Amino acid sequence: MESMIRIILLSLIIFITILFFIKQKKGKKSNTPASPPRLPLIGNLHQLGRHPHRSLCSLSNRYGPLMLLRFGLVPVLVVSSADVARDILKTYDRVFASRPRSKIFEKIFYEARDVALAPYGEYWRQMKSVCVLHLLTNKMVRSFRNVRQEEISLMMEKIQKSSSLQVNLSELLGSLTNDVISRVALGRKYSDETDFKELMKRLTKLLGEFCVGTYVPWLAWIDWISGLDGQLKKTGNDLDEFLEKVVQDHEDGDAQRTDFVDVLLRIQREKSVGFEIDRLSIKAIILDVVVGGTDTSYALMEWAMTELLHRPECLNRLQEEVRTICKGNSSVSEDDIKDMNYLKAVIKETMRLHPPLPLMVPHESTQDVRLGDYHIPAGTQVMINAWAIGREAATWGPDAEKFRPERHLNSSVDFRGHNFELIPFGAGRRICPAISFAVILIEVTLANLVHRYDWRLPEEYIEDQTNVAESTGMVIHRLFPLYAIVSSTT
């Protein structure tokens, strides 16, 4: 009997597979982008690998800068060139301005009530205006200058105590960004609280998980069996409990504070923006700031120091610039940064080679549209491979894979959404509204690190290729912590 069941199941699988390939062959249309062959049920999911940005870049080299894949039942456009990204994020920006639904995002971010993940519409416009006009203005960014200076000074003191020893730069930079963002958004630091650190680790891991049910709904039971559903529920509840306590403490505390929670509560209380902001929206926006602001800035600084340590000639040139401008000063102030052109070039080059989100948060088309000769139906997801665009030889030349900050010194290309060959923060309506906040922290941190100390890699890491290996997840960090030998210049 068992043998007969196996034969029947095998025959059924073979029959479905044959039907799939017949349908795929007959259904191929000339007005759709090129597509790699796909498997029944899962489509092209098997081709993503551990590092989807690299796998998709390899596929685009074969099938072109605009590919149509299927992740389970979901059609997904993969964009791997600046020209096509311009079409998506500028020419047809409104059509592609929405976000696809995701169980992970909805469970964690209050049914996508935040700014980064909310579907395009009136609610999203209202929440974005709150962020742009009240939380992330140039005035607000400047107002937290002392916070940045204080936390950088504390980091430098930690380094001073480790002189001539190996320093874990990854740990230091992670703590710095966590402390700065926590003080700005939540009003105080949480780096000494084990529960908070563990919660952030769980959250970061979950955001990089693959949710089967999102792409193959009738296989959603796999997410339950794998434990993903349980992890989402627990982490979502723990985050809400934490954020609720933060908001409650602010309501009961000093009304004169000006961190982000206080600003949002004041807007809610005074009804000063012309629409209601409820408690869930406040918590979702704060979660956006904490998650997005901490991980991305930390990753960029970690990769910048990685590249500089592996290229001492670049590090020496940066040190020469910073030390010349700040000669006689014990530290670098934010006012000094404006004249540091090579520093800005180093940061641009890091963003080009190591965008913190190599695959940008997916977009989704809200109506049918034509991209060149291709018909793109409503409901199509779009994945823009910022990592591949930053390494496109047609744009950056034959040395596109090489870290060479000099390429930016006489270039007008910037990362603020106007030049589509460099889009680490996105572009168009969905561009990250916190660019200025992130960049000033990155600039002043790197400048102080190279101004006060000399750095070199430990001998055992110089030729070790695993020392530049990537982690997995939504935000790409180093696979292993970055260690460096430090010595004071004084």
Curated annotation (Swiss-Prot):
| InterPro entries for this protein | Cyt_P450, Cyt_P450_CS, Cyt_P450_E_grp-I, Cyt_P450_sf
Q: Where in the cell is it found?
A: Membrane
Q: Which positions, given as ranges, span the membrane?
A: 2-22
Cofactors that this protein relies on: heme
**Which top-rank group of organisms is this from?**
Eukaryota
Which residues bind heme per the record? C432
Topologically, how does it sit relative to the membrane? Answer: Single-pass membrane protein
PROSITE patterns hit by this protein: CYTOCHROME_P450 (PS00086)
Does this UniProt record's set of keywords contain Ribonucleoprotein?
A: no
Protein name listed in UniProt: Cytochrome P450 71A22
